[in-house]
Structures are given as C-alpha cells and as structure tokens.
UniProtKB/Swiss-Prot annotation:
InterPro entries: HAD-like_sf, HAD-SF_hydro_IIIA, HAD_sf, His_synth_bifunc_HisB, HisB_N, Histidinol-phos, IGPD_sf, ImidazoleglycerolP_deHydtase. Residues 1-168 are annotated as: Histidinol-phosphatase. This is Histidine biosynthesis bifunctional protein HisB. Zn(2+) binds at C93, H95, C101, C103. Mg(2+) binds at D9, D11, D130. It comes from Buchnera aphidicola subsp. Baizongia pistaciae (strain Bp). It catalyses: D-erythro-1-(imidazol-4-yl)glycerol 3-phosphate = 3-(imidazol-4-yl)-2-oxopropyl phosphate + H2O; L-histidinol phosphate + H2O = L-histidinol + phosphate. Pathway: Amino-acid biosynthesis; L-histidine biosynthesis; L-histidine from 5-phospho-alpha-D-ribose 1-diphosphate: step 6/9; Amino-acid biosynthesis; L-histidine biosynthesis; L-histidine from 5-phospho-alpha-D-ribose 1-diphosphate: step 8/9. Its cofactor is Mg(2+); Zn(2+). Its EC number is 3.1.3.15, 4.2.1.19. Keywords: Amino-acid biosynthesis, Cytoplasm, Histidine biosynthesis, Hydrolase, Lyase, Magnesium, Metal-binding, Multifunctional enzyme, Zinc. It is found in: Cytoplasm.
C-alpha cells in the first residue's frame, strides 16, 4: 500500500543550522524552526508520514565526534515525539562531499528502498529542504520538492498551505488472495473517468452507479474465481472499496458524516449512512430471482455488509418494488447519493462530540 511521505531535511529546515561550523554539536545550538512543530502536527492529520534525510559531513570524525552529535539529536527527536510527531526513519549520511558516496544527498542511496514496490505515493509525497540539493533529490525521486527558507523559500506555514489547500482525497488499496486479486483507487473530489472491471457485467454496472451518483472517481480492477461463482469477487470488492473510501477520508475533519436519500422510480429505496467508526448494516430487500444478470441476488446484501464493515460505517438500506433489476439498481444509486452527502467537507472540525470517528 503506497504512503504519502514527506522527506524532510534536518539542519536548516527542522532546526537552525549554526553558521560557525554548520554542526549542531551541543545543546545550546539546538533551535527549532518557527512553526515547525505545529505544522507537522497539522500535516500528520492529513495522513502524511515523515522521514528525516540529512547529510552530516564528517560525522564520527575528530572534527565532528558522534557523541557531540547524538545527544542534541536524540533530544530533538524526543521533543518531536512528545508532540506526537514520529519519523518513520532517520536517514543520515556521515560522509563528506569528496568521498563520492552514493548515500549523500542528492544521490538516492538513502531513499532507494522507498522507491521500490509502490511503497511511495509519488503524486502526494515530496522533499522539503532549504538547499538546492534537496530539490535535486526530489527530482531524482520523481516527486515534488518544496524549498524551505524564510527569505528565498517557503515558511512552514506556507508549506502547510501548499500541501493542504487542494488536498486530493485519494487512496489505493490492493488485496490479493488465492481467490481474487482486487485493486481499487478512489478519488473523493474528482468526478468522471471511472474504470470498473470485475469480470461481472451486472456488478460493473452497479458499481458505476455508486461512482456516478456519489460524484467520485473509482478505478476498480478485479480478477478471480468467477468460474466457480461470484461470491469471492463481490465480497472482496466490497471489502477493498470500503477500505479505500475510509483511507481516502483521512482524518475526516469537516465532513458532513451523515447522509440520507429516498429516490423513487418504479422501485423505491432509502439509505441512511453514518461514517461513525462503528460498522453495522441493516438491510431489507427481497428479490424474486436467484440471478440478476450475471450477479447472484443473495450477494447484494453481502456486498454492502462487506463494504460497511471495511468502511467502519453504520448503514441502513431498504428497497421496494416489482422489477428485480430496478430494485437492485436503486440500492446502489441511493447508496451513491447518500455517500455524496456524507463525504462533503463543510467545516473544519471533526463532527463528533467524542473527538473520535
């Protein structure tokens, strides 16, 4: 599962860089940059992870003893931790420029493992630093670079604004089992351009109703044992779609949380949705036939149950009517319309008196 990661320089970006010897080798030289802690706390709420990447010229040499470095460094880490800021890794190159090593920024040696196996969400990750070498590193990694610096670059407040002002609520979740391979991406703030292929034509059509009526974009690719039946495919797509929506919602700050809808055709359906963090499904719908197209009618309830529990939401669904196709379609339409209401960001705070969803 790819992650949104900020690769952050240390000296000159997180803390001040001493002008005498460019070494933070004593406690009296340790000075945090303005707004850095509050900014990282905010960025954490937007599901960013942090990796510290720093060149420490000659670390461990007579001119820069490791003991002088590690004490203020560990104190700095402890201060960040006390505020809930955790660095997934602290990557340090101890070599001087003349060594020609491959780990020194802007070379990729220290970060190479982050570029493997889709670990990194490149569209939403970036390098933050005060030097040109940090921007070259970003280019070498194929991600955004943001130059920090109160004079020629951005302040921490500027950086937060840039990374959150057009926050694209996007997520990708992959689930591979011996029965199915399911990959789902969702964009909660983009509309149209959905791609859905589950191997089941009716199921594809129903999932498209969710995308269209919730005004979100979905890319759903699934392959599996539909030669046996549709059970595992429908179930696993429900699980992965629920997880993807939940992940894309992020910290849920400002969302409406609740939604309800009651559309009418020759079939009527209603849906009540609460993105509550408490999974529950109440489902009432009956079908005359075992199959609707190539989809088992008994799997309709199971799909919404799988989705609700993976999304950690409370979901009530009911449909009435004569035609099985219309009743089925109305359930997916009404869920899409209800989801659209619930995921809209209309405020800034978490919509919960408990402070937790």
């Amino acid at each position: 599962m790819s992650e949104k990661v900020l690769f952050i320089d240390r000296d000159g970006t997180l803390i001040s860089e001493p002008l005498d010897n460019f070494q933070v080798d004593s406690f009296d030289k340790l000075e945090f940059k303005q707004d850095v802690i509050s900014s990282l706390i905010t960025l954490k709420k937007f599901n960013y992870k942090f990796v510290m990447v720093t060149n420490q010229d000659g670390l461990g040499s007579k001119n820069f003893p490791y003991k002088s470095f590690i004490r203020p460094h560990e104190f700095m880490i402890d201060v960040f931790l006390s505020q809930g800021i955790k660095f997934e890794e602290v990557l340090i190159c101890p070599h001087e420029l003349k060594s020609g090593c491959q780990c020194r920024k802007p070379n990729l040696g220290m970060v190479q493992h982050w570029l493997l196996n889709d670990m990194l969400d490149k569209q939403h990750s970036c390098v933050i630093g005060d030097r040109k070498t940090d921007m070259i590193l970003a280019n070498n990694m194929g991600i955004l670079g943001i130059r920090y610096g109160t004079k020629q670059g951005n302040s921490w407040s500027d950086i937060v604004f840039k990374l959150t002002k057009k926050h694209d609520r996007h997520a990708k979740v992959v689930r591979n089992t011996k029965e199915t391979n399911v990959s789902i991406e969702v964009w909660l703030d983009k509309q149209g351009g959905s791609l859905i292929n589950t191997g089941l034509n009716m199921f594809n059509h129903m999932l498209d109703q969710i995308a269209v009526h919730s005004c979100i974009r979905m890319k759903i690719i699934s392959s599996g044992d539909i030669c046996v039946d549709d059970h595992h495919t429908v179930e696993d797509v429900g699980i992965v779609l629920g997880k993807a929506i939940l992940k894309a919602l992020g910290n849920k700050l400002g969302i409406n949380r609740f939604g309800f809808a009651l559309p009418m055709d020759d079939s009527s359906s209603y849906c009540l949705l609460d993105i509550s963090g408490r999974p529950f499904l109440k489902f009432r719908s009956y079908f005359k036939h075992q199959y609707i197209g190539d989809m088992s009618s008994e799997m309709v309830r199971h799909f919404f149950q799988s989705l609700a529990f993976a999304m950690k939401c409370t979901l009530h669904l009911r449909s009435m009517g004569i035609n099985d196709h219309h009743r089925l379609e109305s359930l997916f339409k009404v869920f899409g319309k209800t989801l659209k209401q619930a995921i809209v960001v209309s405020g800034k705070n978490l919509p919960s008196s408990k402070g937790l969803l």
